[in-house]
A protein has these predicted regions:
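Catalytic phosphate/metal-binding cores of nucleic-acid and nucleotide-processing enzymes, i.e., regions
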Residues: 1-5, 132
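Conserved P-loop
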Residues: 4-94
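Conserved nucleotide-binding/hydrolysis micro-motifs of P-loop NTPases
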Residues: 40-43, 65-67, 110-111, 142-145, ...
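Hydrophobic anchor at the start of a short beta-strand
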Residues: 34, 136, 154
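Phosphate-binding/switch region of NTP-binding enzymes
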Residues: 141-176
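Phosphate-binding/switch loop-helix module in NTP-utilizing enzymes
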Residues: 72-132
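Sensor-1/coupling segment of RecA-like P-loop NTPase cores
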Residues: 128-144
Length: 176
């Protein structure tokens, strides 16, 4: 069997998580065990209401001890949240083993690395030593120095226009 591949969906445009979720639904529809792990989001996004009910689809609960965005946290809060993110990564690795996943989606993991909450080297080590049949999708603003050379696919979502630029808020059912 051919070794599974690594995908990165990055950029400042909308659609990274949407593309990753779309691929995960396709894989699940083919009978693949899927693990979805969201790193910097709470577990209230609308798609989770559907995904949690799919057979062979496993969601690793995100760390949600704060209502703040990371940029709003003080140094102590960032340190504590970073510990939770590292534990979340360990839980994700265990879920891959437990469910014999063939697809792993790590949503916003690249941003967790960029913010210093997760080691780029630890992520790259996992990618290099993952099971041969584990396809991996990672999302975030930009590939990291260690993940960039490991990726087979890198797709950049570019923002041309976004309602947020006009001060409009995210909408239930569309953005979350």
């Amino acid at each position: 069997m051919e070794k599974a591949r690594i995908h990165i969906y990055c950029g400042d445009g909308k659609g990274k998580t949407t593309a990753a979720i779309g691929l995960s639904v396709r894989s699940c529809g083919r009978g693949w065990p899927v693990v979805l792990s969201q790193f910097l989001k709470g577990s209230t996004s609308g798609e989770l209401n559907v995904l949690r009910n799919l057979p062979n689809y496993h969601y690793v609960e995100a760390p949600t001890t704060t209502c703040k965005f990371v940029f709003q946290m003080d140094d102590q809060e960032k340190m504590e949240y970073g510990q939770q993110v590292r534990q979340h990564f360990a839980d994700t690795v265990e879920a891959v083993k437990k469910y014999h996943a063939k697809l792993l989606v790590m949503d916003e993991v690249l941003d967790a690395v960029a913010m210093g909450m997760l080691s780029d080297e630890a992520l790259a080590e996992f990618l290099r030593n993952r099971p041969e049949d584990l396809e991996v999708v990672m999302t975030g603003r930009a590939p990291t120095p260690c993940t960039n050379p490991l990726a087979d696919y890198i797709t950049r979502m570019q923002k041309v226009r976004h309602p947020f630029d006009k001060g409009l808020n995210a909408r239930l059912g569309v953005e979350f």
